[in-house]
Amino acid sequence: MANKKEKSVTMPTVTDAGAVQEDVWIPAVCHAQCVDQGCLMKVHRVNGVAVGIEPNTDIENYEKLVRNRGKLCPKPYMLLQKVYNPHRIKTPLKRTNPEKGVGIDPKWVEISYDEALDTIAAKLKSIRGSDTIKLAEARGTASIRNEGWWAFLRSFGPTQILWGGRSTHCRQAQHAFGDRIHGGSACVPDLDYCNYLIVIGANPAAAGGAAENPLFAKARERGMRIIAIDPVLSATAAKADEWLPIKPGTDCAFILAMINIILHEIKIYDVPFLKEMTNAPYLVGPDGYWLRDKETKKGQVWDPVDGRAKTYDDPGIKDFALDGTFEIDGVKGTPSFQLLKDHMKQYTPEWAAAETEIAADKIRRITKEFVENARIGSTIEIEGARLPLRPAATHVGRGITGQVHSYQTILADHILAILIGGLEVPGSHMGGSTFAKGRRSKEGYLFRGNGMSSGVEVGEDGMQDTHHRDFQWPPKSYSGWEMLIPFMDDHPYPKPPFDNPAESLYSMDHIDWLNLVDPPKGLPVPPLPEMWIRHRCNPILALGESKYAIDVLKRIPFTVSISYTMDEVTDFADIILPDQLELESLVPIFAIREAGHRKGFMIPLHQPIVEPLPNIMNINNVLAELALRAGFIDEFNVQMNKVIGFGDKDPEKLEPGKKYSWEETVDKKCKFYTSGKYGLEWFKQNHILVRPVSIEEAYDIHFNMKAKKLRYPVPYMEVVKRTGDELNRNLAGKGIDWWPTDEYTALPVYFAPILEEAPKDHDFYVVNCRVASTSWGANVGLPWVNEISAQLRGVGDVLMNAATAKKRGIKDGDEIWIESTTGKIKQTVRLCHGIRPDCLLISGQFGQWGMPVAKETNRASISTLLPISIAWTDKMTGNQQWIAVKAKVSKAK
C-alpha cells in the first residue's frame, strides 16, 4: 500500500483546526468526469471534510481486475476543489429581470426549494400532453448516467433535444458503424496481445485516461511498436516509434492506400476469415445490390467446386469464390471481394502521398510491417481456448470522427482489419460486447456493459444486424436527425414509434439550434419550446457560432438550469437549482465493463463522502419530486422500473402511488443486481463486487459470431447503399435537395476534405485537441486545473511551428489573431517544432466568459471559429466538422 501522505492531495484550508475526531479513507468512484465509466478511488475524510484522494489499491488483484489498475488521471483530484468551490450556487435562485441576454444582470433572488419546485412543476403540468412538444432538455454525461433523468423524460412524454456537444465531440461514426459491423460502439485495440499499433487521429497518451494508459505502458514494455499519424507531435506521437505528420482531413486516404497495397502489391490476406466470417464471397448484381435467389430471396455465393451459385447458408457449399464474375440466370454476379479489389485500384500509395503529404515509400513500409506483424494464420491458446492471433491493429479517434465524411474512414478502417482477419480476436481491432443488456453470473449477480453496444444481433442474410430507422415525415426533432441520418439510433434501448427525440443518445445538436433560427427549405421545423431544462452541458461554448444558441435561449419563455456555478448559460435561466456534486452524491455505477478492459467485471457503489450542503438535493430526488408535483409520479415509477431493468413480477420494482427517495431506489437496484443478496447498506460497507472475466467473455463477440454462424457485414455495406437510395428517393419526394446522399456507399470512397474549400488566404489548419485535466469544460473553473494547464506547453494557448513563426516575425509569447470565415479570436502563441508548418493547435474546453475563475484565464476556444451549417455536417452521422478549420493569422498589435 502506498503512503497516503506522500500521494494524496490535501487542502489544509478546509480542515478542522481542532482535535481529530475522525480520520478515514472511504472507497469511491470517479463517475462523472469523462465518458469512461468509473475509476476506483478512495477519499481521505478528516472530521467530515474531504482532504485527499488517491487510487484505490485495496482490492485484491486490482492491477488485473480493476479497470483503472490503481491509477487516476488529474480530474478526480479536482473534486476536492469542486465540492468546496466558494463560487458554488448553494440555494435555488429566481430571475427577477425579464430581459435576457449576454451580460444582462438577471437580478437573482434566493427562493426556497418549495417555491422553485412548485414553479417548475406548474409549468410542466401546463405543457404536458400538448399536441406539440413544448419541453426541451439538455444533458451531459452525468445526466445520462442518472436513471432519474431517463425516467423523468420518458414519463413526462415526448421531449425535444437542445443539447450542447453530443454531435460536436462524440465519435458518432465509430459508435454507429462499429456497432453495426461488430457490435461495438467504441473501437479499441487489444493491447494485451497487440505488437504493432497504428494510431490515427487519436491521442490516448493524453486523453485515454487512467484506464487506457497502463495498458499502453505494459504493451510498450512488451515491445509493441506504435506508429502515430497526426498533424501534431502529440503526447502519443512523442512516445511512438515513428511520427507521420499527416495533412489534416486526409486520414482516409492513408488507410485506403494501405488496403490498395495489401490487395495489389503484398497480396497476402486472411482468405479463410474472408470466406467464413465476412460477406466477401457474397455476389453483387449490376445494380449494386445482393444477387438473390429467386425462390428463397436469400443472398448468394459462388461455389467454384460445383461451378454454380448457392444461397449463403446452403449446407452443400464446398468452397467460396472471392474472385471473378459469374452469370446466374442471365445476370452477372461478382463477389464483393472482387469489387473491393477493383475499387481500390484507384487509391495508390502515390495518390495517397499527394493527399496526405506522407511519402509513398513510407506508406508501403508501414503497410508491409502491419501485415507482417499480423501473423496471418497464427493462433494462440488462452485459458485452454484456441483463438486466432492477429497482433496488429489500428486505433482511431476523434481526429477521424470529428470530420465530415467520417463513415468512409471508419468503413476503410474495418476493411483493413478484416483483410488480416483482425476483428474481435486477440491482438486485434476490438470493441464489441454482448453484455449491453446484461448477463447474470452463476451466483446471480448481474453484470452489464456499456448500453450503447448492441453485441451480436442476428441480421439479414446471415450477418450481424445493420438496422436503421425507417423514413419518417414530418420529422419530430428540430434538426430532423431521425429522418436525415437513419443509421444513428440506439439499438439496445427500447424503440417505440419515433415520437420522442429525447429517447436517443444521438442527435445533430448544432443543427437543432440553427434550424430554430434559420430553418432550411422545405423542412417543417417544430415550434420553439416553451420550457428548457438543462444539466451539465453548455451549448453556447460547445458548438460553433454561439449566436444561434444565444438567439434561441433569449426566446424560450421558461428555462431551468441545474448548475453548480454561474456560467454562460445561467444568464438565460428563469430558475436555477443548485447541483449536488460528486463527493456529495449516491451513484451506483453498475454498467462498467467496456472493451478496453477485458479482465474483470465490477459492480461498485459511489457513496456520499461529505454531507451535501443543506439546501442542495440530489438530482434524482429533484426529478422524482417534480414528477409528483406535476402529477405523473406513477408514470415516473413505471419508467424507472424499465430503466433499471425490473420486470413486472420483480419484488424490487417501484409501485404506483408512491414517491421513492433516491436512497430507496438505489437499495432496490443493489438487490436487483445481486438477486436479492445485497442491498445499499452492504455496498456502503463493502463498496464493490468484482470477478474475473473468462476467456469466452473477454472475446465474447468472436465466440458468439461463431456460435450463431454469423458474418461481419463488410467489406461490402450493401445495406448502406440501399438505405441511401431509399433516403434519396424519399427526400426528393419531399422537395429536399440540400441533404446529399452520395456518401451512402457500399465501399469506402475518398471525398476531398471540406477544409480545402476555405478562401486562399486562410492558409493555416487550426486543429483541436483535449487533455485529461481540462475535460470537462466546467473543470476550467478550478484553480488546480489552470495550474496544471499552465505547466503543459500549449494548453490554453495556441501552438505554432517555430520555423513558420520566424518567417512571419512572430515570437514566442506574442499575441496573434486567428480568423476563420465565421469567427475571430486573439490568443497567446507558443512555438515548437513538433507541429506541421501549416498547422496551429488549440486545446479544447476553454473560452469561458461567464464562469468564475475560468473567465479570468483569457483563453480562447476553437468553437468560435467553427461554422454551424449543413455543409459542415456529416451526412451519415450528423457530426459537426469540428476537429479542424482553416483560418488566416496576423500578429496582434
Model-derived features with residue positions:
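Long, contiguous, secondary-structure-rich segments that constitute the structural scaffold
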Residues: K4-S8, Q607-I609, N615-S675, L782-L799, ...
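N-terminal leader/propeptide and maturation segments of large enzyme subunits in energy/redox metabolism
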Residues: R88-L117, R128-G129, K267-R365, R440-K442, ...
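Glycine-rich phosphate/diphosphate-binding loops that line cofactor/substrate pockets in enzymes
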Residues: Y113-K134, C187-Y196, H343, I366-A393, ...
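Flexible, glycine/charged-enriched surface loops at secondary-structure junctions
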Residues: S130-K134, Y269-L274, T379-E381, E424-S433, ...
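Extended redox/cofactor-interaction regions of prokaryotic respiratory oxidoreductases
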Residues: W149-K218, R222-M224, A253, D323-G324, ...
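Flexible glycine/proline-rich, aromatic-decorated loop/lid segments
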Residues: A235, E568-P604
